[in-house]
């Protein structure tokens, strides 16, 4: 395995900024490792051990770093958790994803929309109209049950299976059109497919004449923060299903990165 080295940029404006960059490199390396000694961090950031130790002592005083379970070992502190949590709670789904929604609309020429989960419902909170007229007739602020349509199912799929059980215990699955899944078992199959592929597709199961491709936007914990989707004609979807799915998947991954999602650091809750 190749060892990752956390090195500051070669050129920095002044000594003060250089110190900040080096300190950040130490924090980044410690977060990546989980815990480490001063010597291990010094090797990772390519700095003298004595300098790294002084940084750690300063960070410890700010509660950004704390002593680990073994002597001489450091780990991220509660202050770092508080700081990160404070930043994340200020991330608004609409604001963070807007650049992604705009690019997706420009690429597909289709109407794109954003939805979030509120209880057992998916709430549509943003829509950017495309060049074509077809669209789901759901107003901003409108809702759909979580098993109905591509975006709602994208949100439900990335909840724990225990939530699926809770949802279906409280919900009666009835098809909205003749092309919709007809029972709980059929919906669960679609959820498992979405969980495996990262994409949810509705082919006329909400409104006849309208298909939708959606994908979940995940946060730093791997939780579904929102669902990005676009509408298109069913025949257009069926002509190149894989390419349309990849566009939704790529857009959602871009938005997920903006929420701090990193696949290598997230463990499954399923």
Show where each model-derived region lies.
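Short, solvent-exposed recognition segments
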Residues: 2-6, 133-206, 270
